Regions:
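N-terminal nicking endonuclease/strand-transfer module with a His-rich metal-binding environment
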Residues: 1-166
Length: 166
């Protein structure tokens, strides 16, 4: 059962990038990849900052922290989990900078993804809404599609959790 979560980052992505790329959690850094940026935390941070400055984006949201967790009963190698994280970013956020890191230090394998908030082609910020094509509901849909391709279990009919209520 693949579970996804996404939250906005404010001020700086660096702290999150340093955490997710920790060599003690990522098989010595072998399970860290950069998409449209360096896999190195400091370099990726600088590249993301440069992209924000290029498009003069000064908003509060600097990026997003995406968490993708897999059921410990699923037969999944570290490399396959990492491939799923990379493929999720490539399908859903192809024009964004991201660092994908697979953590293997716990009983359950999980991915952390730091995604820059700025589209490298348009300069527009990611649309942070539940139902938009870049939104959390589509994150789950794409993650579930890829998980099924790898023969993993997915949650059935679980609505997205929205902390805001009417």
């Amino acid at each position: 059962m693949t579970v996804t979560f996404r939250k906005a980052l404010h001020k700086s992505n660096l702290g999150c990038l340093i955490y997710i790329t920790n060599p003690n959690k990522t098989d010595g850094g072998l399970l860290v990849s950069g998409i449209n940026c360096s896999p190195d935390a400091n370099l990726a941070h600088n590249e993301m900052l440069m992209m924000n400055r290029l498009y003069n984006n000064k908003g509060r949201r600097t990026g997003y922290h995406i968490y993708q967790s897999f059921n410990y009963t699923d037969k999944l190698s570290y490399e396959e989990a990492h491939e799923i994280g990379i493929e999720t970013v490539k399908r859903l956020y192809p024009n964004f900078q991201a660092v994908v890191a697979t953590h293997i230090d716990k009983a359950h394998i999980h991915n952390h993804i730091v995604l820059n908030s700025v589209n490298i082609k348009t300069g527009k910020k990611l649309t942070d809404s539940l139902w938009h094509e870049e939104g959390i509901s589509n994150l789950r849909k794409v993650s579930d599609e890829i998980s099924k391709e790898y023969g993993l279990t997915v949650l059935n009919d679980a609505p997205p959790i929205n902390k805001y209520s009417n």
